[in-house]
Curated annotation (Swiss-Prot):
This is Nickel import ATP-binding protein NikE. It comes from the Bacteria. Part of the ABC transporter complex NikABCDE involved in nickel import. Responsible for energy coupling to the transport system. NCBIfam families: nickel_nikE, PRK10419.1. The gene is nikE. One of its GO terms (cellular component) is plasma membrane. Belongs to the ABC transporter superfamily. Nickel importer (TC 3.A.1.5.3) family. ATP binds at G45, R46, S47, G48, C49, G50, K51, S52.
Length: 266
């Protein structure tokens, strides 16, 4: 059984203008995907193709117009209050914009402790122990707990968001362009940390990105998305064999590791 799946998902947004006219835009067209326990799947596509919309549907932040999202085989719409609380614990989302994903006036301690307050019954002492454990896990010093988001670096803030996602021992983390704003060294560090956590805890990842280079480093299976549809599914080891035009464009957009000097011809 899949950990999480989307079955024939359609998402249509309807907008209304000031003069009363309305417009319908279909963002997702008949999407079906599944992710197994401990698996890393990449969702690859250009900006605006519907990747983030699908991510929000998978974590229950939005509902599909038609189709079902299922967690351990049960539709999210069938979960009762306790079932939805368990789902919130087991499926976490890390956003691209880490400064926008946290309260600028909250301490790091409060940010990491937020899911512990809402999704567990831990008392204050045990919450503090868990926060310190998480800081060690993401390799941050204990004193950072008293700082505000503006007092830490971008790489540190992304690790804080990872720690918050890990706080309630999730089975699946959806990373929505979560390392795209980091420089290449911080990206490598974040991916190494996520890989280590997966090896230790069996976490599954859905890695949402436009960067094929990162897919090659992190995922085992790749779903290519274009204009709200999954247009290709391929193993990461076979990425050079991608056939769809959208897939080839993404492959061609990957920069070489070093600038290529043009060869002069006479």
């Amino acid at each position: 059984m899949s950990l999480i799946s989307a079955d024939n998902i359609v998402k249509i947004y309807q907008s209304h203008s000031l003069v009363g006219a309305s417009a319908r835009k279909t963002m997702l067209h008949d999407i079906s995907i599944s992710i197994g326990q401990g698996e890393t799947v990449a969702l690859l596509g250009r900006s605006g193709c519907g990747k983030s919309t699908l991510a929000r549907l998978l974590v229950g932040l939005e509902r599909p117009t038609s189709g079902e999202v299922r967690f351990r085989g049960v539709p999210l719409t069938k979960l009762d209050r306790s079932g939805m609380k368990a789902f919130r614990r087991e499926v976490q989302l890390i956003f691209q914009d880490s400064p926008g994903a946290v309260n600028a006036r909250s301490s790091v301690r409060a940010i990491i402790g937020e899911p512990l307050r809402h999704l567990t019954s831990l008392d204050e002492t045990r919450r503090e122990e868990r926060i310190q454990e998480l800081l060690r896990l993401v390799e941050l010093p204990p004193e950072i707990a008293d700082r505000l988001p503006a007092q830490v670096s971008g790489g540190q803030l992304q690790r804080i968001c990872i720690a918050r996602a890990l706080a309630v021992n999730p089975k699946l983390i959806i990373l929505d362009e979560a390392v795209s704003n980091l420089d290449i060294h911080l990206q490598a560090s974040a991916l190494a940390l996520l890989t280590k956590l997966q090896q230790e805890g069996g976490i599954a990842y859905l890695f949402v990105t436009h960067d094929l280079r990162l897919v090659q480093k992190f995922a085992a299976r790749c779903l290519v998305m274009d204009e709200g549809q999954i247009v290709e599914e391929i193993k990461t080891a076979d990425l050079d064999s991608m056939r769809h035009p959208a897939s080839r464009l993404l492959r061609e957009a990957v920069l070489p590791p070093l600038p290529v000097r043009a060869v002069e011809t006479n």
